[in-house]
Amino acid sequence: ELTKGKAGFEIYDGFKPQPGEKIFTKTVNSCFKESGLLEYLREKQAKEVVIAGLMTDYCIDATVKCGFEHGFSIIVPKHANTTTDNEYMTGKQTYEYYNGFIWQGRYAHCISPEETIERMKR
């Protein structure tokens, strides 16, 4: 379950925030709505945002499109989002549909993790 306080909400150990890093909690599909993240990114004059997580066809899609609408260059590392099967497509098909068709070249740069890391070093 993806609810604060539940096991499914916990941050993977390899991605846990470092001391002093800011944490934003979202309560709706896009992380930009009423979380303070948008204001923080604007204050920091961020130009590029890397997006990863669950669920491809809900929260990730909303965040990618909202980030794009707010003027950010959006990076979605390959295999850094996932979802479940629905009544129309398998999770894999949904992933491929969004990452390979809907976002790529329109709203985001869907690139390899290695390329993402290189861009983050700039």
Question: Model segments located where?
Answer:
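Active-site-adjacent betaalpha module
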Residues: 2-122
